[in-house]
Amino acid sequence: TNLFKPMNKKEARAKFMLPEGKKLVLFGSLKITDKRKGVDYLIEACKLLAEKHPEWKESLGVVVFGNQSQQLQEQLPFHVYPLPYIKNEHEIVNIYNAVDLFTIPSLEENLPNMIMEAMACGVPCVGFNVGGIPEMIDHLHNGYVAQYKSSEDFANGIHWILTEPEYDE
């Protein structure tokens, strides 16, 4: 059987003590601070979203998994739920199923497994138009392909998924 598949969101959130009433955005990387992973663009996109949608400050959270995940707590305008780097595939499946969207602001990527895994779990993705990402994300269908290095368009992608009726629970 395929390990990566949609599961009960409430149960998945309970496993990581994540809140039920919030929309949760996921960002994960072995090393969060690696500039190639584009975390600065995610931070900037979140700041833009918080300015445009101040009401989201209470209703949106960011789940970050990876080494140095705690470092983002001070830099993001939304509540951050830091998790360590997770190698166990069953736990990774639960993380995908606990969130509302997966962000991959990488500045260089081939065919990122994390997009395939998230999508197999039914989670829409936002990524930049770089490497294999545009071949994996069907723009405005199962995710959003943002203009390369545009924090503003990345924010548009997060906003689109969070407000698209198809993805609203």
Q: Where on the chain are the PLM-derived regions?
A:
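Short acidic/histidine- and often glycine-rich active-site loop of Leloir-type glycosyltransferases
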Residues: M116, V130-L140, Y144-V145
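Conserved donor-binding/catalytic core segment of Leloir-type glycosyltransferases
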Residues: P19-K37, I43-K47
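Aromatic "clamp/platform" in nucleotide-sugar-dependent glycosyltransferases that forms part
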Residues: L107
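Conserved acidic donor-binding segment of nucleotide-sugar-dependent glycosyltransferases
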Residues: H139-L140, Y144-S151, W160-P165
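Short hydrophobic beta-strand element within catalytic cores of glycosyltransferases
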Residues: P124-G127
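Nucleotide-activated donor-binding/catalytic signature segment of Leloir-type glycosyltransferases, i.e.
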Residues: H53, K57-G61, G66-H90
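Short alpha-helical donor nucleotide-sugar binding micro-motif in glycosyltransferases
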Residues: N94-V99
